[in-house]
From Swiss-Prot:
<feature type="domain" description="Radical SAM core">
    <location>
        <begin position="17"/>
        <end position="238"/>
    </location>
</feature>
<feature type="binding site">
    <location>
        <position position="167"/>
    </location>
    <ligand>
        <name>GTP</name>
    </ligand>
</feature>
<comment type="similarity">
    <text>Belongs to the radical SAM superfamily. MoaA family.</text>
</comment>
<dbReference type="GO" id="GO:0005525">
    <property type="term" value="F:GTP binding"/>
</dbReference>
<dbReference type="Pfam" id="PF06463">
    <property type="entry name" value="Mob_synth_C"/>
</dbReference>
<dbReference type="InterPro" id="IPR010505">
    <property type="entry name" value="MoaA_twitch"/>
</dbReference>
<keyword id="KW-0004">4Fe-4S</keyword>
<comment type="function">
    <text>Catalyzes the cyclization of GTP to (8S)-3',8-cyclo-7,8-dihydroguanosine 5'-triphosphate.</text>
</comment>
<dbReference type="InterPro" id="IPR013483">
    <property type="entry name" value="MoaA"/>
</dbReference>
<dbReference type="GO" id="GO:0061799">
    <property type="term" value="F:cyclic pyranopterin monophosphate synthase activity"/>
</dbReference>
<dbReference type="GO" id="GO:0061798">
    <property type="term" value="F:GTP 3',8'-cyclase activity"/>
</dbReference>
<keyword id="KW-0411">Iron-sulfur</keyword>
<keyword id="KW-0949">S-adenosyl-L-methionine</keyword>
<comment type="pathway">
    <text>Cofactor biosynthesis; molybdopterin biosynthesis.</text>
</comment>
<dbReference type="Pfam" id="PF04055">
    <property type="entry name" value="Radical_SAM"/>
</dbReference>
<feature type="binding site">
    <location>
        <position position="267"/>
    </location>
    <ligand>
        <name>[4Fe-4S] cluster 2</name>
    </ligand>
</feature>
<feature type="binding site">
    <location>
        <position position="33"/>
    </location>
    <ligand>
        <name>[4Fe-4S] cluster 1</name>
    </ligand>
</feature>
Amino acid sequence: MHWPPEFGKVFMILEDGFSRRFHYLRLSVTEACNFRCTYCLPDGYRPDGRKSFLTVDEIRRVVYGFAELGVKKIRLTGGEPSMRRDLPAIIETVANTAGIEKVAMTTNGYRLKDRAQQWFDAGLRSLNVSIDSLDPRQFQLITGENKLVEILEGLEAAQKAGFRKIKVNTVLLKNLNDHELSQFLFWLKKQPIQLRLIELMQTGEMDARFQKHHQSGLPVKTRLLREGWTQQNRNLTDGPAEVFSHPDYQGQIGLIMPYSKDFCTNCNRLRVSSVGKLHLCLFGEEGVPLRDLLQADEQNSELQSRILEGLTHKRETHFLHDGDSGVTPHLASIGG
């Protein structure tokens, strides 16, 4: 138990059995997506008529509950969050929650050019934009959409809107974009962003594609160190990326390598799906249902108790090395 003076009461901290503390929540607001990325939803999003996604009030209650437990950063994910018409209201609700210091969002950038200012004004301060290729034809091959130019224009719009923390997510894909590293590095010379190169991860529906396209990030790390890039220290709410900088580049490189040794040692995030399930790991269990405790503000104590009890079941590590990707069918199902 801890007693921060600003609360004036006993304050429970999210800590698991391996002394890892959790200050970061990834909150999915929808499973729907308008892209057909080869590594996630190659056949497009197929709606399940039985599902309804968390309402703004339910989002307010779950964020408040986690904030009281010490969460400081919320990342809105999907699917594609901008598919929600009430996204500005969601952003504003999260940003106005006491204790939340940073609101971020991961997006495919489809609506970024037109909505960046609106999102910034609502309280969003950090963006991750998925760009898996700088070649328009290859981008369309990977995502199913010929939208690279518009998304790059969206990055410019985001910078003009006031965003100072912009990252670009690029999934490393053997035989699809693994030859583009030099092009990305050239782009970073004058782009004040962080390029996050992410190893393709195995999920239930992606076994064959994983075997065909998985590319280790270790050769990239070796090249960066050889070319004078230096690794940076991690902050409390940072993700799992190994971040590198270079004096000749305005941008940075972040490597996310879930198959590397000790990847889970510094885990600092939990996930809540768009239907209100707490997921302890991207590659874990069925999830702990929370939605029944998001129907009234008076349920907050019971909600927090269920979260804390669920956390006792968090495993020390994933088992991807053994081919065990858990029950996650695809990354859109729990927010990646």
